[in-house]
C-alpha cells in the first residue's frame, strides 16, 4: 500500500538553499553562504544533502575550491589513524 502511494507522486527533496536565499550568482567571497555547503570537517556536502541542481552544485563546488585557495575556507581535515 505504501509503495502504491509513492508511484504517482513527485519526489520530495530537500529545499534548495540557494533559491530560498535568493542567490542568483554564487561568489567565492561569500563565505557565510558557502559554509552552509561544507561539513564540520570541511568536506563539500553532496547534492542529495543540499538539494541543489547539478549545475548549482558545480558552481558551489568551484566557489568553495576558490575560497579554499584564498584561505577563506578550510581544506578537509585529515583522518586520524
Swiss-Prot record:
Disulfide bridge positions per record: none
Name of the protein in its database record: Small ribosomal subunit protein bS18A
Family: Belongs to the bacterial ribosomal protein bS18 family.
Domain of life: Bacteria
Keywords assigned by UniProt, alphabetized: Ribonucleoprotein, Ribosomal protein, RNA-binding, rRNA-binding
Subunit note: Part of the 30S ribosomal subunit. Forms a tight heterodimer with protein bS6.
Stored HAMAP family: Ribosomal_bS18
GO annotation terms (biological process): translation
Database matches in InterPro entries: Ribosomal_bS18, Ribosomal_bS18_sf
Function as written in the Swiss-Prot or TrEMBL entry: Binds as a heterodimer with protein bS6 to the central domain of the 16S rRNA, where it helps stabilize the platform of the 30S subunit.
Entry's Gene Ontology cellular component terms: cytosolic small ribosomal subunit
Coiled-coil stretches: none
Gene: rpsR1
Record GO terms (molecular function): small ribosomal subunit rRNA binding; structural constituent of ribosome
